């Protein structure tokens, strides 16, 4: 999809210097830009390179607000990276569908309710009483259990499995291979026989609006309560979230992180890759955990600022301890 610079300025909340009628077809980096592309320059020291590139126009910060004689049109934003992301989303969007399509190989019971312009791919299997909102796109081989509710404008990519009773909000993206709402890891040990017995998982999974779920993510349904993923949260590939976990709004979790059952993660938290959280742990709002950090079971973590290590601690303390260990090891040589 293409758009004029004037349209992109309006959609991104940017001010415009230069030809407002210029049509932009795509986005690119400086090294691969063409005369039809929009590029991004967040640092003033690279502005000369951006001007020298073949790009049609540049998204820049306020440092270029007075560059009225610039050789290329400029979109000027207080948050240029965000403006570029919004422009990229507009330019990569596809033309809206004029109608829904259900592939003839899909299994669709008569109790399924479709909104407008829903697309259902090949070999999709839908359970009884599934409700699917307007403009939802379901990829090939998706399996959706009974009583699932999906909001509007969602993208569900191929081979996703959504277990019964799961509720998914609006504008949610679920990438290939994700499994949502499976049974949690809940077992009770018989002390006499040593045998483990499953605790029935009767809760549900609730996913808020504007959540992105990466490939091969697994999220368990609740045991007695619901598992909740807050609006605006982004989950990278291969993240696991256990039963009864409650994640606040706008949380970011990187790949290979494991969240044990009944954890609570406050809104706005940032969690790096390969982080591990023990069961019933709590992260307060705005927590920042670096990669491979560990949170002990039942810990209430209140530290502010970047934290690293196992158990996790403030970055300055972590670095001091690492330096001390290094000095000790050299003394013993």
From Swiss-Prot:
Its EC number is 2.3.1.191. Gene3D superfamilies: Hexapeptide repeat proteins (2.160.10.10), MurE/MurF, N-terminal domain (3.40.1390.10). GO terms for biological process: lipid A biosynthetic process. Keywords: Acyltransferase, Lipid A biosynthesis, Lipid biosynthesis, Lipid metabolism, Repeat, Transferase. Homotrimer. Pathway: Bacterial outer membrane biogenesis; LPS lipid A biosynthesis. GO terms for molecular function: N-acyltransferase activity. Catalyzes the N-acylation of UDP-3-O-acylglucosamine using 3-hydroxyacyl-ACP as the acyl donor. Is involved in the biosynthesis of lipid A, a phosphorylated glycolipid that anchors the lipopolysaccharide to the outer membrane of the cell. InterPro entries: Hexapep, Hexapep_transf_CS, LpxD, Trimer_LpxA-like_sf, UDP_GlcNAc_AcTrfase_non-rep. NCBIfam families: lipid_A_lpxD, PRK00892.1. The gene is lpxD2. It comes from the Bacteria. This is UDP-3-O-acylglucosamine N-acyltransferase 2. The active site is at residue 243.
């Amino acid at each position: 999809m293409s758009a004029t610079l004037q349209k992109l300025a309006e959609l991104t909340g940017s001010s415009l210097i230069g030809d407002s009628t210029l049509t932009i077809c795509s986005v690119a980096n400086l090294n691969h830009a063409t005369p039809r592309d929009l590029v991004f320059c967040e640092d003033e020291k690279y502005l000369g390179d951006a001007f020298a590139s073949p790009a049609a126009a540049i998204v820049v910060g306020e440092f270029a607000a007075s560059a009225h004689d610039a050789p290329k049109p400029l979109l000027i934003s207080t948050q240029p990276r965000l403006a570029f992301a919004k422009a990229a989303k507009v330019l990569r969007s596809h033309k809206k569908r004029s109608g829904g399509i259900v592939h003839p190989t899909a299994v669709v019971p008569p109790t399924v309710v479709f909104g407008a312009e829903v697309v259902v791919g090949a070999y999709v299997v839908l359970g009884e009483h599934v409700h699917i909102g307007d403009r939802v796109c379901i990829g090939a081989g998706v399996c959706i259990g009974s009583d699932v509710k999906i909001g509007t404008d969602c993208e569900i990519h191929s081979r996703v499995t959504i277990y019964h009773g799961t509720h998914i909000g609006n504008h949610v993206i679920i990438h290939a291979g994700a499994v949502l709402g499976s049974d949690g890891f809940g077992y009770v040990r018989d002390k006499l026989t040593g045998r483990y017995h499953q605790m029935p998982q009767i809760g549900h999974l609730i996913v808020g609006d504007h959540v992105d779920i990466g490939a091969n993510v697994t999220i368990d349904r609740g045991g007695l309560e619901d598992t909740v993923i807050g609006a605006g949260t982004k989950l990278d590939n291969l993240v696991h979230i256990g039963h009864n976990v409650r994640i606040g709004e706008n949380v970011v979790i990187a790949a290979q992180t494991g969240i044990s059952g009944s954890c609570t993660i406050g809104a706005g938290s940032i969690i790096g890759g390969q982080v591990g959280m023990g069961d019933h742990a709590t992260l307060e709002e705005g927590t920042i955990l670096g990669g491979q950090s560990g949170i002990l079971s039942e810990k209430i973590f209140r530290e502010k600022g970047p934290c690293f290590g196992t158990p996790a601690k403030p970055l300055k303390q972590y670095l001091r301890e690492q330096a001390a260990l290094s000095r000790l090891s050299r003394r013993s040589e």
